[in-house]
């Protein structure tokens, strides 16, 4: 054998592949499986459950980061800060419903001015009615 330990697998066998790479995910399937087992959510955890949960978590993270990146770009910034996360989540109807009771540290508040506090719009007719003869 070349450069390996003696014994073990044959030199022609392929290397091990993680469950995350098999599923095409960036989130760790093995870690999610371990956390599901240690969390006492159920006595047994199926093989597909951590893959599905990791895929859902990866999708949610990608969705939030995309919207936060757009908010950062709108503010002419290159780095996402908690304020951008807050703006992204609160401006999206579904994410706001999902994370409605979540407080984001250093997120600030949503800008809102009540209609009664805005200046009144005056109709522009071109001529003042009192000056007409």
Swiss-Prot record:
Signal peptide: none annotated. The keyword DNA damage applies. GO terms for molecular function: DNA binding; protein heterodimerization activity; structural constituent of chromatin. It comes from Coccidioides immitis (strain RS). It holds the Pfam family Histone. Belongs to the histone H2A family. The modification N5-methylglutamine is found at residue 106. Keywords: Acetylation, Chromosome, DNA damage, DNA repair, DNA-binding, Methylation, Nucleosome core, Nucleus, Phosphoprotein. This is Histone H2A. The record marks 120 as: Not ubiquitinated. The modification Phosphoserine is found at residue 130.
């Amino acid at each position: 054998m070349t450069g390996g330990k003696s014994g073990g697998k044959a030199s022609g066998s392929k290397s091990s592949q993680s469950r995350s790479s098999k599923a095409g995910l960036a989130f760790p399937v093995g870690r999610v499986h371990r956390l599901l087992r240690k969390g006492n959510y159920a006595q047994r955890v199926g093989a597909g459950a951590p893959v599905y949960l990791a895929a859902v978590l990866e999708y949610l993270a990608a969705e939030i980061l995309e919207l936060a990146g757009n908010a950062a770009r709108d503010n002419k910034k290159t780095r996402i800060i908690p304020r951008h996360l807050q703006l992204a989540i609160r401006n999206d109807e579904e994410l706001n419903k999902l994370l409605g009771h979540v407080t984001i540290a250093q997120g600030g508040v949503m800008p809102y001015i009540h209609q009664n506090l805005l200046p009144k719009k005056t109709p522009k007719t071109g001529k003042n009615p009192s000056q007409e003869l």
